[in-house]
Amino acid sequence: MTNKPDRVVLIGVAGDSGCGKSTFLRRLADLFGDEFITVICLDDYHSLDRKQRKEAGVTALNPKANNFDLMYEQIKALKNGESINKPIYNHETGMIDPPEIIEPNHIIVVEGLHPLYDERVRELLDFSVYLDISDEVKIAWKIQRDMAERGHTYEDVLAAINSRRPDFKAYIDPQKEFADVVVRVLPTQLIKDDTERKVLRVQMIQRDGVEGFEPAYLFDEGSTIDWIPCGRKLTCSYPGIRMHYGPDTYYGHN
């Protein structure tokens, strides 16, 4: 980065492992460029490596396996325009690598399992998003990612999913209560008995009353749009689109 920003905007993106956070943000960073946006994976603040977690009988989702004090101090420093020496968690080896220098940037996105868990970190954020992925979709995505990108076996992935589920319910899922926007991804209702998970149902839920953030209005409130491609012909492989906009209650919020 060549110019020090006048103000650092801090965005938090929370969600379970394998829900698409890193993939989405890598593409966002490619779009805006490194001179404008920096993405930090909060896995880098694991205080225990993979072997140590196994020996201690804890998962990476457990707060005991993460250094929230260092996370808070370094994110606060970046927000104040200061550079940091951030640790690196190596997903391939499961080890903690030597730190790297991170400079402040116009937009810094902190993504991972716990950006909304610690109140101190949460209060630093200017805006927050929680990715709420259904179990059916999450399992399909995580198997694809961990086997292709991280060298895990199918059995290892399934075992990890089952062992992490209690900690997800205890430490990760409750964070959506604090998010400004929740993006829910569920299996489609347009294809009967869909198993490929290539067509998905997506809901974007925006909290009312967030300062400086106006909700997106796609069409009139209460409207529903149905589009069936090709009419009754059988030449289209895609099922179409169904859209609805209107008020709702989610996790106790309107």
Where are these regions (language model features)?
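Phosphate-binding P-loop
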Residues: 2-8
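Conserved nucleotide-sensing/catalytic segment adjacent to the nucleotide-binding pocket
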Residues: 35-41, 47-93, 107
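Short hydrophobic/aromatic beta-strand immediately N-terminal to the Walker A/P-loop
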Residues: 10-12
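C-terminal accessory "lid"/substrate-recognition subdomains
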Residues: 2, 107, 123, 135, ...
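The conserved Walker
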Residues: 17
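Conserved lysine of the Walker
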Residues: 21
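Hydrophobic positions on the alpha1 helix immediately C-terminal to the Walker A/P-loop
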Residues: 24, 28
